[in-house]
Amino acid sequence: MYSGAGPALAPPAPPPPPIQGYAFKPPPRPDFGTSGRTIKLQANFFEMDIPKIDIYHYELDIKPEKCPRRVNREIVEHMVQHFKTQIFGDRKPVFDGRKNLYTAMPLPIGRDKVELEVTLPGEGKDRIFKVSIKWVSCVSLQALHDALSGRLPSVPFETIQALDVVMRHLPSMRYTPVGRSFFTASEGCSNPLGGGREVWFGFHQSVRPSLWKMMLNIDVSATAFYKAQPVIEFVCEVLDFKSIEEQQKPLTDSQRVKFTKEIKGLKVEITHCGQMKRKYRVCNVTRRPASHQTFPLQQESGQTVECTVAQYFKDRHKLVLRYPHLPCLQVGQEQKHTYLPLEVCNIVAGQRCIKKLTDNQTSTMIRATARSAPDRQEEISKLMRSASFNTDPYVREFGIMVKDEMTDVTGRVLQPPSILYGGRNKAIATPVQGVWDMRNKQFHTGIEIKVWAIACFAPQRQCTEVHLKSFTEQLRKISRDAGMPIQGQPCFCKYAQGADSVEPMFRHLKNTYAGLQLVVVILPGKTPVYAEVKRVGDTVLGMATQCVQMKNVQRTTPQTLSNLWLKINVKLGGVNNILLPQGRPPVFQQPVIFLGADVTHPPAGDGKKPSIAAVVGSMDAHPNRYCATVRVQQHRQEIIQDLAAMVRELLIQFYKSTRFKPTRIIFYRDGVSEGQFQQVLHHELLAIREACIKLEKDYQPGITFIVVQKRHHTRLFCTDKNERVGKSGNIPAGTTVDTKITHPTEFDFYLCSHAGIQGTSRPSHYHVLWDDNRFSSDELQILTYQLCHTYVRCTRSVSIPAPAYYAHLVAFRARYHLVDKEHDSAEGSHTSGQSNGRDHQALAKAVQVHQDTLRTMYFA
């Protein structure tokens, strides 16, 4: 079962005993890869020339605290000007907006703490701040040079932080910073997304250590902001009114709820006090209109009366409201009862939208931002010219120079694996540009379908019996060709309506038809029925379900039908295709389990929903079949809390499926940012070891722990136009880079395993945090690339290895398992646990998959 080609691997090094306080250190790069044909590339990294000087680090303490960074920057700017003669002289300090200030020459304050008073001219009255400055340390740029050339074991974090602050100081004052990016409203042309939102374009900038050099990573980026506009217009956009005039009566409850959801948390400024445009944060929307909403008003006589908002504005501001029938915004703190009519408020400019975009907004956003690779390359070059870092006075102060040209990199295009099919002819497919064809091929192991049912939740007048009959015929024909025959007609074919009818219908099916293998469910577009079908099928009754959109039943295409079959065969226990055994890397010579892990978090702005952790494990030698485990955990918790138990379950399942104990565990971990590497590695590596030791005292398989990252800003471009692929002119599938722009000492690489269809391809970044198995660069890169070809839903290589992709699907499916029946779909609805305060145990039970589903790839 586990025979393969090529030389045997070095035996895994026995893991050191797990010591709680021990800091695990990522392994050094073993070598550079050589496999594949070379390709000349350019990366959006710009070489930095750094002097070998010391930088002086000071800590600032600004009172009163809690000012936004923008205000802190103004305070420091005023401070440097005001105390120029006494302290700062001609120095140009840089500041991170919080506490850290850096200078190229020491300030004449020695080691003492200095207290200063700074006045900011404000609207109405000046604001006074107390600022203390204290010396922290000398940051040596010489040490950075030593680390980059390998003379020091690790790159000193504080030097990178200092350089980052230097490079970001001026852009932070010019633009709106968001994370590591800077944005600005487009001059002259707006890019509306609807619902009061618009696209802002900007750029990402970060300082990164690489082999021999520090690099500046620059990329174009875009994000959604709220449009600066009167709140009255915002209401119209959110509630789809052509103009506010069509709303002559108060808002209905559902309109008010929708409006509240959108405006809560946003900042508004008032327009009824002349130049004094005070800003407030919205905490709620009143149930009553301005004509009826009252508040306690203290009169001159000292007595308090209830006054309506409309009356108050008429008496106090001589303003007769035009829309007294509309509600008010409640602003500031809830207990303070400050109400503002909608018509005197504007949405403040420059507020980023952190709430989830609707499907329409997302597709508009993609259309507005997708750029072919050559276009993106040109835009980045333009950006560099306009940023002109070499004339930035702050960058020059520290003696830093940045090259204007992108970095030339030599990459390699790896050979794709051969894909083996089944049937009589055992056909072999060879991917070309990450794609292959299943025509005239049969599944490696097709499942025969004898008992199946159709449930149609689309209206009968739109999806007629003729449609259903023709769809069934087409499905049976393509299934025969694919080597997965459907015997006979469905045993049941009925129409149904609404999510409430799902469970009774499925119970009836399960009890009536012995050996029922599959229920095909037809849906009329986006509907809460989907979540309910998956909840009942996956967690309550343990039935295999396949949902199909009505439009794909009314008009069948070979493409949609074969996509359905790829999914159905796998859900029922079949194997679509496998990697050609003789082409696999040597790691397959002994039993090996591939694990994929991911944690998905609820959308920002939703403080109550849990995060979901999913881990999947391969269950055969191909590897093709996978088994899933899933848990709910604390909101926004990044580390997988119950990993030891999850891995233990998967190891037991692997043994049941194969009768082998894996001698190696290859763990692909998605969704971890660089700042969390150490923490995640420490906790999760120990958890995997604990899972092994709990199974058997001396069981110590070699563990390789690899973090997969897609959310980064590295982009690669072909230098030679003839190498560009497809309409978007991207790099070829299989392009790998492990030199020049990678980590100075650690084992990491970029691999673009998919063919980019729209926009510029984003290569995945792989960082090896632990490796008992002593992989060479070639072997790990080839293994990773081959695993990107084993994703069952399509006949193309995907952008990350199948196990990591499946973990993502499992976590995503668990979100649907948590959806309350009375609400709508997983995107927009409350998840159980918020609306009715379900405790952790109930949530944990809700995502637990039924015993019969557990061993299947229900998530495919």
From Swiss-Prot:
Region of interest: Interaction with GW182 family members: 588-591, 651-661
Locations listed in the record: Cytoplasm, P-body; Nucleus
Keyword RNA-binding assigned: yes
Sites bearing 4-hydroxyproline, chain numbering: P701
Alphabetized Pfam families for the sequence: ArgoL1 (PF08699), ArgoL2 (PF16488), ArgoMid (PF16487), ArgoN (PF16486), PAZ (PF02170), Piwi (PF02171)
Region Interaction with guide RNA: start-end pairs: 312-317, 525-567, 710-711, 754-762, 791-813
EC numbers, comma separated: 3.1.26.n2
Transmembrane segments: none
Protein name as catalogued: Protein argonaute-2
Organism in which the protein naturally occurs: Bos taurus
Encoding gene (name): AGO2
